A protein has these predicted regions:
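Transmembrane beta-strands of outer-membrane beta-barrel pores
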Residues: 105, 182-188, 217-221, 287-291, ...
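Face-selective signature of the C-terminal outer-membrane beta-barrel domain
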Residues: 328-357, 386-458
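Solvent-exposed loop segments that connect transmembrane elements
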Residues: 223-258, 293-321, 362-389, 429-458
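Membrane-embedded beta-strand positions in outer-membrane beta-barrel channels/transporters
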Residues: 38, 98, 126, 143, ...
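Cleavable N-terminal targeting peptides that direct proteins into the secretory/outer-membrane pathway or into
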Residues: 1-31
Length: 458
């Protein structure tokens, strides 16, 4: 049903007109006219005005990031037209790129849900010159550039839909500065407050060298409650509801609140050496650790035999293992050297990253499906609470060499070479706690044998 608010619209129009009139009067009195700040981007691997870039591009400055309260790549969708993402919570967002530009993505959102997806996405992400997807904190970021449409020429594979570039602040040779920020927030249906804090320091070390460092910590409280969590002892074995009946007893269950909470620790060191206008060397190291709990989902009670569903309280899950932790450790090292050769700028960018994951995924619903259809699946084991122990590594060595012409020349050009050696591994063994011990429990059997015989000898 459409609604109109003519009085509000008229008031807004009047206020806007008054504001414009006041601005015009002020400009006439002072003789000053408002000036628009030029936006400089590096989409073409050179610094140039965003107005001269022949691409559909959006650039978001550090001030805009701060004013809008943007925290990570998922939140960029609030400011960038055409950039879409399915926010599946920190458990999924930290491992997989759900970014979509112009409707292009490597696969549907659901297929990326449970664990790391090592396939190359159709929207590439760069941290400075490092081609890597992580849901990076938008802290100490100078600018975010979003390029729409195919960018394979300059940004290689994974850029069919577009490219998202995070350009971080570099050390400042002429300024000593310290910046400390913190914030506290609340989430509906959560039992606690979320918070974060960060410190940034820039230290000139003489006239040609500067060091920049930042570190921070954030904690996001969950809002999903696990109503039916199975208990395990310190050895990972089931705690029985009836210890006197190990053959048929179910788990002992309890409730866990806010299972989908997460925290993030990160730090970065950056050293710049610039002995003159014709040469610069930047050395950068980043370390980051994430911990995420369960999934931010509301499950539906489902009967596998009849297909019927039952209502359950909102913001709850009945998974037997609702706490499905994911731990991620990221290390990025990069060395960038640039030299002015007169007619162009020659740049060498060398980088290495090591992205590691460990996580647990509850498969109890899958086992329930088979056990419901066949009571003797797993030999009739009564305590089905299976899960995967996932382990994933993603390592890459990248070298890029490029020659970029000077701006303002009649003929602009860029030439370069790119090499990447990427190695990925994913292992996901499944375990069923307590099954081995249960299948070797002592049992008893009664055997009866009756026989009789006769013989006739002659």
């Amino acid at each position: 049903m459409a609604k109109s608010y003519p009085l509000v619209a008229a008031a807004c129009a009047a206020a806007l007109a008054a504001s414009r009139a006041a601005s015009a009067d002020t400009a006439a009195e002072t003789g000053d006219s408002p000036a628009l700040q030029e936006v400089v981007v590096t989409a073409n691997r050179r610094e140039e005005s965003v107005l001269t870039v022949p691409y559909n591009i959006s650039a978001i400055s550090a001030q805009q990031i701060e004013e809008a309260g943007l925290k990570d790549l998922q939140s960029l969708t609030r400011m960038v037209p055409g950039l879409v993402s399915a926010d599946l919570g920190p458990r999924v967002n930290s491992t997989n790129s759900n970014l979509i530009i112009r409707g292009l993505n490597a696969s549907d959102q659901g297929s990326n849900y449970f664990g790391p997806n090592l396939a190359v996405p159709l929207v590439s992400t760069y941290i400075d010159d490092v081609p890597l997807f992580v849901n990076y904190n938008l802290t100490d970021i100078e600018r975010v550039e979003v390029l729409r449409g195919p960018q394979g020429t300059l940004y290689g594979s994974g850029a069919v839909g577009g490219t998202v570039k995070l350009i971080r602040h570099k050390p400042d040779l002429g300024l000593f500065s310290v910046d400390v920020t913190s914030d506290v927030s609340g989430t509906d249906h959560s039992s606690g407050a979320s918070y974060s804090f960060e410190g940034i320091i820039n230290i000139p070390l003489g006239e040609t060298v500067a060091l920049r460092a930042n570190a921070g910590y954030s904690e996001q409280k969950g809002f999903i409650n696990g109503l039916h969590a199975a208990e395990f002892d310190k050895n990972g074995q089931p705690v029985l509801a009836d210890p006197t009946n190990p053959l048929t007893s179910d788990y002992l269950y309890h409730q866990i609140n806010d299972v989908d909470g997460s925290n993030n620790k990160y730090g970065r060191l950056s050293l710049l050496w610039k002995p003159g206008n014709s040469f610069s060397l930047l050395v950068d190291y980043t370390h980051e650790r994430d911990h995420s709990g369960g999934f931010s989902w509301q499950d539906v009670a489902f009967n596998y035999q009849t297909g019927a569903t039952r209502d359950r309280p909102l913001y709850t899950t009945t998974q037997r293992i609702p706490q499905q932790p994911l731990d991620r450790t990221l290390d990025i090292g990069a060395i960038t050297a640039s030299v002015d050769v007169g007619f162009a700028t020659l740049t060498s960018s060398s980088s290495y990253y090591d992205n590691r994951y460990n996580d647990v995924i509850d498969l109890s619903s899958t086992e329930q499906y088979y056990i419901t259809r066949n009571p003797y699946y797993y030999g009739g084991y009564p305590r089905y609470a299976a899960f995967n122990f996932d382990y994933s590594t993603d390592k890459s060595l990248v070298e890029e060499l490029r020659l970029v012409s000077k701006a303002g020349r009649p003929w602009d050009y860029i030439a370069g070479a790119f090499y990447q050696d990427r190695r990925s591994l994913l292992s996901d063994p499944e375990t069923l706690p307590g099954f081995a011990a249960w299948s070797h429990l002592p049992g008893s059997a009664n055997n009866y044998n009756y026989y009789a015989g006769t013989a006739f000898n002659t």
